[in-house]
């Protein structure tokens, strides 16, 4: 149930009846403060201006046409023309019942779309590092949310599996295999890449051989394709271990590497030339874009084919967008790529639109994100100043969580402790990132993310177990509880119920904006409201069975909402902590 959408429709109808244009925006929002009700309609100001009347006068006229019987207990005008809406307790009670009767907690399904989500995108023959964390987990939270809402989601892991470096890597792999050390060398991908690069820089004969190998690989030679495939397979096998540890839904089937688009590139360059979009300039093929200016104020030239015939990332990204629309039949494409790539993507997409490869009706959205910083405010590095490997980061998270869990549960069996430490440690790393607005940089701080206070994974996981503990203590007759009515008579019951019923609205925002921090803030709010409700509205010692059962049902919906909400973020819940 989307109460915001229901109220928007009702207020909109009343505004039109009061003389507003048919496309008027009621601007119904969740109220920021309890005294302003549960919802507030803020659209009178803009519409009144168009109608040449005072906003408060319009609000008064709207109220004469607004029928919220059975939904609102009170509707009032505030300030210059805001309409405050207070929900009817009986309406809240009925909606709580309906939410509990549904596996989806009453969340409706929007029109199903095919949505391609581009995220993670590690490079072949390199280990994943902290720079891959944000794209991987924010993208996966978006995927989980969109799938829960019923969309057909295609995960696209745009792996860096092509380029001139592969001649060097294949030459080095061949050398290692001749020395019977191929498998051992590939066990340490980072070292393998580093050694290959060192030889390439220092040994001219090796470098020449590597350059020849690139040509042979690009011409489709079977032996070189096989060597290339081996490098890709080993990298993706290692990456899959990381994805599984992170509780991320990516699999090998989701790999759509740069190499996938290679066959399309010559045709795209030829087509852009034929359409008069691309021209020859100093031996290269260039698209000049009026939308982007260089330092001199002239249209910026975007190279799509180099003088030597090589293609660029832009060419691949043009092909990629075209493929996602024409072959994958995307209705919407989301890219979880860091903010530094924004101009590059905008240029590629401008060319895509001009060439008619993807119509304007299909959004191409750059859901950019900021950087992960150390406590010093600089990019997160090892003490020695190197890049932090993702596997090392997760190892440390697990070790810190083990100590934390063992401290609180000294008698817990080892296997249970390990399972709990894993949920807490990995959850802490993910939640610390997901709870921040993705567009900003954020400080990575172990102490904050593993704290049991504040908007953290351990606090949210604990809040969930706290709700479950109510049911462990209660001697519950499941059948009697299922048929018991919900009674909302206390303010704290009403506040908790109203917030729980905003779950669908929260999911809708996350799906539209790609902002999982909105879900984190919502769940944290729910946990806080439950805490206040638990303290002031006795559950197990309620004055009678009817009130007890009603409050148990509110607790039940709280537990289900926390679990489902955390699941859309890819955060594991636990039964006890």
Curated annotation (Swiss-Prot):
Q: Which GO terms describe its cellular component?
A: cytoplasm
Q: Where in the cell is it found?
A: Cytoplasm
> Recorded E.C. number(s)?
6.1.1.19
Chain ranges for the short sequence motif 'HIGH' region as given in the UniProt record: 122-132
Q: Which SUPFAM superfamilies match?
A: Anticodon-binding domain of a subclass of class I aminoacyl-tRNA synthetases, Arginyl-tRNA synthetase (ArgRS), N-terminal 'additional' domain, Nucleotidylyl transferase
**Top-level class of the enzyme under EC nomenclature:** ligase
- Primary location recorded for the protein, binned into one broad class: cytoplasm
Matching entries from InterPro entries are given as: aa-tRNA-synth_I_CS, Arg-tRNA-ligase, Arg-tRNA-synth_N, Arg-tRNA-synth_N_sf, ArgRS_core, DALR_anticod-bd, Rossmann-like_a/b/a_fold, tRNAsynth_Ia_anticodon-bd
Recorded hits in CDD domains, A to Z, give:
Anticodon_Ia_Arg, ArgRS_core
* Superkingdom of source: Bacteria
Listed GO biological process terms? arginyl-tRNA aminoacylation
UniProt keyword terms in alphabetical order: Aminoacyl-tRNA synthetase, ATP-binding, Cytoplasm, Ligase, Nucleotide-binding, Protein biosynthesis
Gene Ontology MF terms in the entry: arginine-tRNA ligase activity; ATP binding
- Pfam families, alphabetized: Arg_tRNA_synt_N, DALR_1, tRNA-synt_1d
What this protein catalyses is: tRNA(Arg) + L-arginine + ATP = L-arginyl-tRNA(Arg) + AMP + diphosphate
What does the subunit section of this Swiss-Prot or TrEMBL entry state? Monomer.
Member of which family?
Belongs to the class-I aminoacyl-tRNA synthetase family.
Identify this protein by name: Arginine--tRNA ligase
> What organism, scientifically named, is this protein from?
Salmonella heidelberg (strain SL476)
Q: Which gene encodes it?
A: argS
